[in-house]
Amino acid sequence: MRHLLVVAALLAGAAPAAAQLMPNDQSLVTFNRYIAVRERRVPGFDSPGIPLGSFTLQPTLDANVLYNDNVLATQDDRDGDVIARITPALTANSNWSDSLLSLSAIADIDRYGRLGTENTVNTNLSAYGWHDLSRATRFRSLVRFQSLRESRESQDVFVLTRRPIRFRTLELGVGARHRFANTQVSVDGGVVKSDFDDAVRRSDNILIDQDFRDSVLKRGRARVEFGQSPAVAYFVQGTYDRRTYRLRARDPLASARESEIVEALGGVRFELPILARGEVGVGYTRGSYRGVQFTPVSGLAIRTQVTFFPTQLTNVTVSAERRVSDTGVPSSGGFATLSGSIRVDHELLRQLVLGASAGFRRDSFNGADRDDERFELGASADYRLNRHLSARLNLSRLDLTSSGTGAFKSFVANRLLFGVGVRP
């Protein structure tokens, strides 16, 4: 069941160019010694789903009321509004012994009290599956379609448009893994096609062409794990990305922004009796671009997340990452991100989970004199009334500072959310 929950969470993710195309396959080190607070299945509060033949259906409905004091993420003339957000979702997981098929449909429907131009509907349709050819060999595949609106707070925003920019992505992925005694080899690859709609500038109704962002991303990844014990495994991992743009034949800028990004990592995955589990990966990354105006970006690569369990009711999760990504900003080929965060979750009286988080992120853009620094703070409370009904309260603050001659905007946004969740 825990494996299915992880798959569902990954399939629900939405991003223009996801950092991870395929969900991670099962590692040599499976996390089963400790149970994180938000993973715990509490008797009497866990929804069993609806049996339907060889599938189990998990319909959900989340209804939230959100207040954002800076909806447009502007530096001056901040405009706040109340948003009603409805999120219906349906997941169907097969009950087969040697295979899994997981189908998912999710929609996020936002309706604003005053700023009707911000009303959005985001959809996510996906199908993920795996089949065990033998105890040692597994094949996997993924198909996902998303219709999304770009966040006003995205690092790719370079102009204030009348409505959030709409785009669609189609993702196809395949993967395989094989185990040899205490060694596991896994490979996967995929294609992501992105298509952006044009938008109108908010200040003067001038059409802003977005066709230069239409692209195809091809990704390949290979990973080898060496198991020292059921609780410790060392790994090496390599990832290769190649992005091409639809207008490259007739648009010099689109051709110049075509990129190749490589990443090589080595590290360890563990779940130890010292009350800690996680994965630490360190290595090298390099992004290169066709245009001579965009110099290569290279340096340290980091992908690390470790959870500590000081008590059975408290988790502390620490994350750090450094990577190179492509961007939608026309004056830049891409950007290097350095980020870190800490989150504390505490379970109180079985039904109430309290959380607090803090994070920092720095984006340094290639080809443009621009550095963005984001500081985020958050606090949350999730209350389980029974197996069918839950309630949540979230508070968050984002403080973004953009510097350099190519800086776009600096802003602060505070958000308050109250919501309820319904399960069958």
Enumerate the language-model features and the residues they cover.
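Gram-negative and organellar
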Residues: 20-424
